[in-house]
Amino acid sequence: MIRLALFGSGVSSSLSPAIYRGFAAKRGLRLEYRVYEAGPGGLAPALRMAGELHGFNVTKPLKREALSLASTLDSHARAIGAVNTMVAGEEGWEGFNTDWKGFLDSLKLYTASPPDTALVIGAGGAGRAAAYALATWGAGRVLIASRTGLTARRAAQDLAGLGAEVEPVPPGGLEDAAAASDVVVNATPLGWDGVSTPVERGFREGCIAVDMVYRPLATPFLRRAAASGCTPVDGLWMLAIQAAENIAVWLGLEASPVELRTYALEAMRGGRG
């Protein structure tokens, strides 16, 4: 039995279990993927409660916290300063970041060229991964916004030197930053409730708006962006692509993001997680 898990806040609504169970069932694999609620400082206790695992994912707010549990880090996790995937190794947990790849490849479904200016809203692990992906892809300027500005400034400092100008958005400057950006990314939890959005207005016509929130698919953020003439990219593509990357890390197998997305959509239609 291959035992996998997801740790984080609000994980009961995650579609990850449906994705991995669907993949395993199609291939006749004996695999379980369970979710464990864990808040700040709660990863290590939750891991002990879960028992022996082959690997696991972490989501908000644990992606930075998970760094301290890794015996080794891949180059992306080290540069981003966040982990979302772990696999058991000979000397302990090996940490990976597959979020950046999930984000970047989902964006590349809609554009072949890096943006001149991109705005990432949210400076946690997911936001850092998006900013890293944009900077290393060749974006000219990457703006990072956070609620207080403190984590945005820290992320901008940590991600400097990747080939792009990485700058924090000053307090009160979010709408101006959105208006100046070719790509706008929501890397916050705002939208899970189907009501909230980090940006009410200010989208530049013709921009690409990427939401890491995938439930609902048409989030308030994406609806407002579409109404302003922007191309919306739902968060389910990122989830499916990074899941394919995780399967390669954990099992050494190839997986189609299109197939994995189908399992998630089936679960959404059936009201399952």
Curated annotation (Swiss-Prot):
InterPro entries listed in its UniProt record: Aminoacid_DH-like_N_sf, NAD(P)-bd_dom_sf, Shikimate_DH-bd_N, Shikimate_DH_fam, Shikm_DH/Glu-tRNA_Rdtase
Binding site residues for shikimate: 14-16, 59, 84, 99, 214
Record-annotated active site: 63 (proton acceptor)
A biological-process GO annotation: amino acid biosynthetic process
Keywords: Amino-acid biosynthesis, Aromatic amino acid biosynthesis, NADP, Oxidoreductase
Sequence positions that bind NADP(+): 122-126, 212, 235
GO MF term list: shikimate 3-dehydrogenase (NADP+) activity
Pathway it works in: Metabolic intermediate biosynthesis; chorismate biosynthesis; chorismate from D-erythrose 4-phosphate and phosphoenolpyruvate: step 4/7
UniProt entry tagged with the keyword Transport: no
Keyword Metal-binding: no
Leader sequence segment: none
Pfam families found in the cross-reference section: Shikimate_DH (PF01488), Shikimate_dh_N (PF08501)
Reactions that this protein is recorded to catalyse: shikimate + NADP(+) = 3-dehydroshikimate + NADPH + H(+)
Disulfide bonds: none
Function: Involved in the biosynthesis of the chorismate, which leads to the biosynthesis of aromatic amino acids. Catalyzes the reversible NADPH linked reduction of 3-dehydroshikimate (DHSA) to yield shikimate (SA).
Subunit record text: Homodimer.
Family: Belongs to the shikimate dehydrogenase family.
Protein name: Shikimate dehydrogenase (NADP(+))
Source species: Aeropyrum pernix (strain ATCC 700893 / DSM 11879 / JCM 9820 / NBRC 100138 / K1)
Taxon lineage: Archaea, Thermoproteota, Thermoprotei, Desulfurococcales, Desulfurococcaceae
